[in-house]
Amino acid sequence: MSRSPLKVTSPFEYNPGNSSEVVTYLQGLKGGDLPGTFLLVGANNSPGPAPVGLVYQGPLDAISSDGVSGSGVWSTVAVPASFGAAGTSVYGPDNLGEGQANLVGAYTRNLNGDSPTPEDPAIVGFVYAGAVDGSSEDGWRSVQGITQLGTSGTYTFVHSVDGGLAVGNSDNADVDDLTGYFSLSSTAFIVDLETGAQSLIRYPGQRDPLVTHTAYGIWDNEDGTYTIAGGSGERLKRGNSRVDTGEGYLIDYDSVTGRFSNYTTFAYRNRERTDLISHFEGIYRTKGGAYRLPATSVALNRKGDVGIASVVTVKRNKRGDFKPEANWRDLKVTRSSDGEMSVLSTANSQFGQVTVGFAN
């Protein structure tokens, strides 16, 4: 059965005046209050030392004027000045309706050239509850993750939020220069937005210090359980600081018992190619109970830059665990700058049939 062609809207940006120094990154997506509308979040110039957080409410249409896309409403978002932030990046939303939302992300700090420490971190996560445009000053809360060693992280990112829980990662290491993910053993956690309490995500088997997990997406199954998506990576040799293998994963979390179950990993196109590192960037659950995962796969070798954006569909077996064979659909995206096919694309978030990401 043939698939319908992709409808691509690119660029979709907030760049008043079309400045050549501004790049808009679309990082999180949920449904809006009205049919055909969305709640979209991201940042200008993220990653970077001083990103500007963004929230968009409206349809993802092709209307554009003077560098501003869409017929909806854009808002710039920043954590309160009291946080001492250099910049804000919004990674995930949860639309609560009637103009209210939960937002999660991270903010950068200016260390004036000093190395980060647990007492003086470089990047700190945040959670927010309030008006969708970020204007509720008392709705912001910093999140500094606790690593497996029990120390406060120097880098904390809160990636996704749904149903009152958020997931993220914390570490005392920088990110890998090839994949953009943590190169050392990263600590994935859950944070309760109401209480601020953190819980480590417990993966099965003995914890190998050479294996790292990230948590980039969480979905409330509305039965007391949540499903978490992310990536697992392994450094093949001690002393090698970069991730050398990687697969996307899903794991279930029971918020009542605190139990984790059904951990399953997924290689790019079911191991059709073994030279790519794959990572799930978010999660969406259909009405039929299947999960759509926006995924990014990057080259394992350094022969050339390649980034493949995909949407992966995973279903459950009758006994409730995940079927190991997933359906992968690669997204063929053209660059808005010249109309050529992108060789470096990411799929960052998913809602319904809509994927947002980046192409270069």
Q: Regions from the language model: what does each represent?
A:
Residues 2-360:
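Residue-level hotspots at or immediately adjacent to binding/recognition sites across diverse folds
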